[in-house]
């Protein structure tokens, strides 16, 4: 039996204990001993998409059927551009059609979009039903499946409508990454690099040394990167579940990145690609504020380049960037706040910056026409 590594997300504050486990390993889709304790009845809804369903849906359903768990599938279109109200209503339609009750768990089988949609549906259907994450993309495994952020996009901004709603379990089968396209693998690595930048300089060093192994999908390297990323996120979420302070660090590069996604149209840039370019913008801004050195910016740029990720944003007008960033969830009293680096391995939350410096960064960090 393959080894399993487990991480606890500690959320044991009153009035209820909402702590849960993240299990990481190869072949976990077949490990019903991990999943069944979180299925209170003999019925479950599996939410997935048209890409993942042919690969893993029947494997999961068959394993559950062997234990007399009745399932039905809700198969949604694939892509960030479908993360909206109309798709969410498809989930509600199916839940109502199948007479799902408050004890009927929703299982998210897919990437970040499926996890966000399923989690938001679980948070709101009958005012809350059980929710389990089975992430199948690297980005979802290291980031979006952990921490309880759920929601949908609005034409004016990304993730503007949603809820904090924690899963009961995260089951991460790293074997699903064998079918992940290279572009999506690289996008997930962008979020892994983020963890080293904001919280763990040694992890950043490790990534510099082992990036080729990650890109080659070496199982030991992949499992370590997933585990360390989840450890960092679990620690941060346990200390600040609702992003009142420390958790904001996880948004390094996201203020710029969300502006890129919104301006270019959801799906044109993968989330991790936008975060990569946005992180270089945040690093450039940090250097202009004399928080980090040019040498540190060069190290960051080289690691993203070595991963095959964009290090410059698309050529959008500064006005368009600023307009999109004004809708960022960290805006306070009309002022855009940025997560900035103090060094590799340390970041600071919620800083405003002088507009002239911001414009300099936007000018320097976009691709040539």
Swiss-Prot record:
Its EC number is 4.2.3.4. InterPro entries: Dehydroquinate_synthase, DHQ_synth_AroB, DHQ_synth_fam, DHQS/DOIS_N, DHQS_C. Binds 1 divalent metal cation per subunit. Can use either Co(2+) or Zn(2+). Its cofactor is NAD(+); Co(2+); Zn(2+). GO terms for biological process: amino acid biosynthetic process; aromatic amino acid family biosynthetic process; chorismate biosynthetic process. This is 3-dehydroquinate synthase. The keyword ATP-binding does not apply. It comes from Nitrosomonas europaea (strain ATCC 19718 / CIP 103999 / KCTC 2705 / NBRC 14298). Keywords: Amino-acid biosynthesis, Aromatic amino acid biosynthesis, Cobalt, Cytoplasm, Lyase, Metal-binding, NAD, Nucleotide-binding, Zinc. NAD(+) binds at residues 78-83, 112-116, 136-137, 149, 158, 176-179. GO terms for cellular component: cytoplasm. It catalyses: 7-phospho-2-dehydro-3-deoxy-D-arabino-heptonate = 3-dehydroquinate + phosphate. Pfam families: DHQ_synthase, DHQS_C.
């Amino acid at each position: 039996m393959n080894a399993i590594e487990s991480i606890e997300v500690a959320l044991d504050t009153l009035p209820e204990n909402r702590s849960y486990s993240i299990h990481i390993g190869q072949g976990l889709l077949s490990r019903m001993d991990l999943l069944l304790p979180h299925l209170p009845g003999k019925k479950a809804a599996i939410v997935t998409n048209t890409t993942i369903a042919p690969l893993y849906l029947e494997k999961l359903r068959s394993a559950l059927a062997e234990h007399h768990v009745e399932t039905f599938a809700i198969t949604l279109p694939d892509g960030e551009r479908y993360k909206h109200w109309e798709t969410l209503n498809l989930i509600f339609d199916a839940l109502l059609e199948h007479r799902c009750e408050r004890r009927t768990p929703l299982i998210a089988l897919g990437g970040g979009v499926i996890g966000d949609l399923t989690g938001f549906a679980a948070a709101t259907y009958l005012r809350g039903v059980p929710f389990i994450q089975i992430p199948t993309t690297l980005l979802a495994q290291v980031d979006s499946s952990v921490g309880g952020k759920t929601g949908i996009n609005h034409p004016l901004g990304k993730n503007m409508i949603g809820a904090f709603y924690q899963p009961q379990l995260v089951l991460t089968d790293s074997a699903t990454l064998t079918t992940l396209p290279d572009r999506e693998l690289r996008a997930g690595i962008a979020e892994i690099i983020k963890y080293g930048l904001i919280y763990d300089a040694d992890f950043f060093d490790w990534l510099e040394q082992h990036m080729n192994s990650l890109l080659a999908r070496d199982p030991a390297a992949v499992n370590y990167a997933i585990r360390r990323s989840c450890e960092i996120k679990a620690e941060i979420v346990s200390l600040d579940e609702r992003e009142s302070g420390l958790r904001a660090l996880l948004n390094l590069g996201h203020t710029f990145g969300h502006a890129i996604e919104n301006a270019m149209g959801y799906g044109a840039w993968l989330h991790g690609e936008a975060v990569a370019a946005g992180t270089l913008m945040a690093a450039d801004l940090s250097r202009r504020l004399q928080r980090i050195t040019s040498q540190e910016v060069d190290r960051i740029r080289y690691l993203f380049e070595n991963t095959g990720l964009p290090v410059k944003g698309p050529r959008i007008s500064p006005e368009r960037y600023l307009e999109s960033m004004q809708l960022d969830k960290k805006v306070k009293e009309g002022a855009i706040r940025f997560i900035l680096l103090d060094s590799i391995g340390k970041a600071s939350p919620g800083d405003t910056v002088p507009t002239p410096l911001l414009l300099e960064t936007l000018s320097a960090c976009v691709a040539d026409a």
